[in-house]
Amino acid sequence: MHRSASRLTRVLACAAVPVILTVAGCSSDSGKKSGTDSGKKSDASSSSQPSSKPSKEALEKAVYAALPEPCKAVGAKTIETIVPKAKDANGTAAKSNDLASRATCTWNGLDEAGLKGSQYRWLSISLVRYDSLASVGTGSKRAEDEYAKQVEKAKAVEGAENVKPEEAGGIGDQATSVTFTTKKDGDFFNTSVIARTHNVVITLDYNGTAYEGATAPDQAKLLQDAIAATKETVASVAAANEAKQPEQSAQPEQQPSPSNS
């Protein structure tokens, strides 16, 4: 009887082992499956969330969409003052395929004073406007790059002497003046003023010389006149775009198509 009870105990103990192992195995598999499912759900959840970073940065719209007529960038009174006896007071416009982006006008005049000699003046106003383009940047940034190039160009004129660049405050967003002298058929006193107003670059070149014993031009006065003309041109750029805005707003708004419902 004792042996039978002992044997029965051993049989029950052995029979219980597979049950425990089976339960443990199920628990282990269940945990792995749960973890896998959780990982999949996490991956799916993260992939479904929209990216907070835009694929392309929104470009800042160019401030100016137009240029003034180059030969009207400065007034008739200004031309009469700084280019006396101008050959054509209306100026000569350079050819351009796109006057809304690039325009130039020039004036020249010889003021003859008999025995006192003659004074010659030449003026050029060039305007370049840049749009914002995804491939190259904003209009203002493109204008900044062009402004820097024009300043360096003015400082590196072939044959220039006594080159003196200076920052010119109070003109647009950036401005630099460059004065220098050159020798052609006389001593020419040159002034270049390069200015940037938002996405437009203005390059104003102004020079003068004296003939037949006339007093040489005053370089300081040439610079003063050039700066004043550049400020006037900056104002003309702004005015040209203010005039354009009412035209755009006057266009009738497109009405939504009627609903089919």
Identify the role of each PLM range.
Residues 1, 50-52:
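Hydrophobic beta-strand segments of well-ordered beta-sheets in folded domains
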Residues 1-29:
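Secretory targeting and sorting signals
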Residues 23-50:
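Bacterial lipoprotein signal-peptidase II cleavage site
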Residues 31-35, 43, 54-261:
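A small/polar (G/S/T-enriched), proline-flanked helix-loop surface module common
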